[in-house]
Amino acid sequence: MTTGVGAVVAAPSAIPWDRLGWTLLGTAASAASASMFNQLLERRRDALMQRTAARPLPQRRVGPLPVFALACALAYAGWALLVWKAGWIPAALATGNVLVYALLYTPLKPLTSLNTLVGAVCGAVPPMVGWTAMTGSLDAGAWVVGGILFVWQLPHFMALAWLYREDYGRGGFVMLPARDPSGNLTAQTMLLTSLTLVPMALLATLQGLAGIVFALCATLLGLWLSWESLRFLRARTDAMARRVFLVSIVYLPLLLLVMVLDRGPVSPAAGVRLRGVVDGGDVAGPPRSNAEPRMPSGQTAPASAP
């Protein structure tokens, strides 16, 4: 979903649906690979947790070797599809994300609560894959859409980790809520990051990615999530944490839907303009990096040699 939003917001007025479809397929393959590597490495810990004990690996319904082989095949397929149909930058982002998720985020989970920040980085990459598939560059717009996803994951996951703090403890995972019995630090983190979502989302309007309607909706949604986080800070109960979690689930699809519906011309400050006029002409089609060179006004390109 987030890859598609990043691509649509960055796309020309005439969305290249074939490029979008291949980008979604390649990103899905990469994401599935990362998830499989994660479950392979955590299969023994997953068996100790009520939430994950029924997964195929802990239940031994499938062996580690075929899972490893399929994960490798999906990682390669995702990389190949994205290189072929989207470009080197989205392919590098997606494949790098698989490596970070499997080789950094997963091993950090039993060691430090900072693993959540690394996981949030991984969650921020898919919309950047979509963006770069359409633009061919990691310009400011890519960082804005990625930044929104990064910040959103923090209150979302803190609420989830609070609800399953005992389960995470049984699995030996070092999550902040599992090491914060009072919940005070967890609640403060949720409130701070929820409030940060308001200016973070407004950057999309300032960069020309979306319009005033989006800015208004983003502000209201951010304040709603912040209010629920404040309620959790005042009464640190599972019921309040569940409300934050549910509101965060509502927040993201609504925000992304409004961003797509109210997408605006990308600001020149973002480094590329995708839905308006570039150097005096309309843009439609592949990224500028793959486009034929523009001729100055009044001139025509020389005829090709026979």
Predicted regions mapped to residue ranges:
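Interfacial loop-to-transmembrane junctions
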Residues: S182-L185, S226-L254
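Multi-pass membrane catalytic core of lipid/isoprenoid biosynthesis enzymes
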Residues: R43, Q50-A91, P181-T205
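Juxtamembrane boundary at the C-terminal end of a transmembrane helix
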Residues: L257-G281, A303
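Acidic (Asp/Glu-rich) catalytic motifs at the cytosolic membrane interface
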Residues: A31-P58, P155, R165
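Transmembrane alpha-helical segments that form the membrane-embedded catalytic/substrate-channel core
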Residues: A29-M36, L99-P107, G147-R165, V198, ...
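Intramembrane alpha-helical segments
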Residues: P64-M134
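Membrane-embedded alpha-helical segments that form the functional core of polytopic membrane enzymes
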Residues: M1, V8-R43, A80, W88, ...
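Hydrophobic alpha-helical transmembrane segments in multi-pass integral membrane proteins
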Residues: M128-L138, L197-A204, Y251-P268
